[in-house]
Amino acid sequence: MMDPGIAGASQLLRRAREVFQHDAAALAVVDDLQGRLEGPLRIAVAGMVKAGKSTLLNAIIGEEIAPTDAGECTRIVTWYRHGHTPRITLHPILGEPQALPVARADGRLVFNLGDVRAEDVERLVVDWPAAGLRDLTLIDTPGIDSLSQDVSGRSTEFLLPEDTPMAADAVIYLLRHLHASDLRFLESFKDTAAGKSGTVNALAVLSRADEIGAGRIDSLISAAVIAERYSRDQNLRPLALGVVPVAGLLAQSARTMRQTDFEAMQVLAQMDRKQRERLMLSANLFIRAAEPAGLGSDAKASLVQRFGLFGIRLGVALIRGGISNPTELAHELARRSGLGQLLSNISSLFQTRADALKARAAVVGLEALLRGSPREHALALEADLEKLQASAHEFRELKLLATLRTGGLSLTPELTAEAEQLVGGRGSTAPLRLGLDAEATPEHITEAARLCLNRWRLMAENPLTEPAALDACRVVLRSCEGILAAYSALPAGR
């Protein structure tokens, strides 16, 4: 629908390859940037220690392949990408990559580094035939603010590089509470080379949301209220596109539910309600109790480890409410965990504008390369670079979105919200931009787009509109025109 900024970025990289044809190091950078354009969107999962990053990553993928214990592999940046056959590759800081054995224990992927120390590993790359990785490459990062300076430094170096673009196109940032350290990281992320492009490409997740209400059945309702409050926070709003509450453990276990999990919850559902509630006052009491008959301590310990008390309570309540098979229960638990909303946001905020985010990263990477290159090389590319940045509408949308979220324009709150929506701040499909249902007809879409176009055109023509707001109006107008052009080209009746 919009100007193909990714085509312009690819053309610019071809030109850069000609300019740097005798510089092997620069050509390697250009090749890497071209690979980013051609590959799937890269999303890093970041957060403080014990925020639940690996658990959430497993939930998104739909398989337990990311280690969630406190082992040495959680201290390494690990890439998860789609592959036709399972494969694990260790990339050391010094030396050649080496293949690691692919092994699973109790359904989980096990990483065995052999004699290699975690601090000597630059990254692990896991190729896995998971549908959830077809259009995404997910990057698991060590915890920020770890007591170990080495662990924390790895994440900082990867997520906040000083002179190069970040290796990820977007970030899912997990927080349990809104602390100053979370804001400091997100602010630093925005100030990296990628962030200086004037974009907002972080999505916050209120993680372990089931623990907010002490495991009560209404915990996620309380979490949703808190997430909504955080999303309006004036300190967080300029740094993240939204806040989504997710019970990561519940989401992971729902996506990987076993028949034995369902059968164990069925046994609990048949108990007397008061007896069951007394039994579930604590995890230790639940595991050690002799009742119910037919459910041993090992089975109960597995349930607690996989679902937590909140997940068990919710699963039992759903079974008592009429759910009678594990597939239906898994779908409902995943939906209630908040995973569905997160996946929807990833799709609407990141995947639908993946080309723009990848092109933006390539342009920023080329800018970084030129800063450290001989002046004659920079001069040969600077004009083309500036032309692309000025003409690619996707880049202008991303920059305006960042400006709108910082409150840097003299627009009313209502107009700011509308502009943010029209430039794709809540999703880049035409219905989402126009606030319509996903099933809206082309006629409804063109009618709504025309109304928006006329409203913003009047504002642009108003002599009292300030220059900065006028620039914003022009970007919004171009977005509306893009929608109209795309839908006017459709055959009648579609």
Spans of features found by a protein language model:
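Short, flexible helix-adjacent loops and helix caps
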Residues: 18, 65, 214, 354-355, ...
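Globular "head" domains of long coiled-coil molecular machines
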Residues: 34, 38-281, 336
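Charged, amphipathic alpha-helical linker segments immediately N-terminal to NTP-binding catalytic cores
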Residues: 1-21
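N-terminal J-domain/J-like co-chaperone modules of DnaJ/Hsp40 proteins
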Residues: 395-494
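Short amphipathic alpha-helical coiled-coil/interface segments
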Residues: 30, 366, 385, 473-480
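C-terminal end of P-loop GTPase domains and the immediately downstream helical coupling element
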Residues: 203, 212-215, 221-393, 397
